[in-house]
Amino acid sequence: MSLKNCHNFQDFRNLAKRKLPSPIFHYIDGAADDEITYNRNTSAFNDVDLVPNVLRGVESVDLSTTIFGKKLDLPFYCSPTALQRLFHYDGERAVGKAAQKFNTMFGVSALATVSVEEISSLIDTPKLFQFYFHKDRGLNDSCLERAKAAKFDVMALTVDTITGGNRERDLRTGFTSPPKLTLASLFSFATKPMWGINYLTKGKFELPHLQDYVEEGTSTNTSIGNYFSTMLDQSMNWNDAEKLCSQWGGHFALKGIMSVEDAKKAVDIGCTGIMVSNHGGRQLD
């Protein structure tokens, strides 16, 4: 199977499963605990009925919309995803170029494998930076200032990841960042030689927004759950979010809002948007 034979989401998923070592595939494909939330997220699309109105003249269709004051040609954008270079050696560079091709916004994770500076030099379409609130205040300030200097349009503070999700697939496969060989994963990596060749020859794996402050994730192997549980500030509250919103001074969103009450609080502290999300069921099942 190749890309030209992929015609829907399931085709792409099957191709990824064939191309990626098991720990890498199950990290991106999996979720927390029994994955009930994850499966409900997927099946929910089957519950949506579309009732089209006809005879409207569709020779010219406009899908554009405005988000955070930016006009996008599509009514959706690329949400931030961590560690993209693990899935393909071009990582965020490829996704950013795709977002620019279709004139939509590109979300960059704090755990990205390409820096905000490089992304800014690569594309000129709208960009969002997703931010995790770390215990290290110097790291927090650095992330905000670098994104601001790189002229990112939106800052999104993730608020549903106070601790790491219990991702049972990762426990079974031994997934870490950066990847390491274990007895459980050795065979899987050995049977995907092209992934290994690309990983070793296409530039060093690094987390450029974090590596000057923490070793974990770049030079020291760690699970994502352990990283979140030890590095993120579990005392984060509404006062912290309000200060960050003021410090950013531009479009600011909270990512992970699930209740009307919290949505109203987000408006009260100055947010210009919210991202209604359960993190794909990857944090709380």
Model segments located where?
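An N-cap/entry alpha-helix motif that binds or orients negatively charged groups
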Residues: 1-69, 178-236
